[in-house]
């Protein structure tokens, strides 16, 4: 199950968003405006991927899953485009299923048995992780996701990554 990458555009993602198939995971660690934006969107459209004490302790730097519409994508473009703000997720699954899927990957275990936060939603991390994953890992990580889109602030390009 290799991956295929191609350039995409915000216009293409906006068309998918109109059909309700686009989510974004916004990384508050590199974009301090994210927690307030998530709060303004409300719990039906935006929620931290963290639960419990992690959510309480790390709300200011947490990843937030948001159902994306054209307004949110435009906000990302105008407010966050020059930062490593997060990733786009294309999925027909409902909000709760997408959140549950990604919560499974927030922590990883090191070879020494320590637990670490896995920042897969960082656009600098996701492509490297996907390229180094085997078929079973890709199948598990894609799950209900049809594709990911990552933005590179360095060259200002948006890339769509699909499992093939």
Q: What are these model-derived regions, one by one?
A:
Residues 1-118, 123-164:
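Terminal low-complexity "docking" segments
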């Amino acid at each position: 199950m290799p991956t295929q990458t191609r350039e995409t555009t915000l216009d293409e993602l906006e068309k998918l968003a109109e059909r309700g198939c686009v989510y974004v995971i916004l990384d508050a660690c590199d974009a301090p405006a994210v927690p307030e934006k998530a709060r303004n969107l409300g719990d039906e459209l935006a929620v931290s991927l963290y639960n419990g004490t992690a959510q309480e302790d790390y709300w200011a730097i947490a990843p937030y899953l948001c159902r994306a519409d054209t307004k949110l994508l435009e906000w990302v473009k105008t407010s966050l485009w020059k930062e490593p703000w997060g990733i786009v997720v294309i999925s027909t699954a409902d909000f709760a299923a997408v959140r549950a899927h990604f919560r499974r990957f927030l922590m990883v275990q090191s070879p020494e048995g320590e637990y670490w936060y896995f920042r897969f939603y960082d656009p600098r991390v996701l492509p490297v992780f996907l390229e180094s994953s085997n078929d079973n890992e890709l199948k598990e990580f894609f799950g209900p996701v049809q594709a990911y889109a990552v933005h590179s602030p360095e060259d200002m390009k948006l890339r769509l990554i699909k499992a093939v």
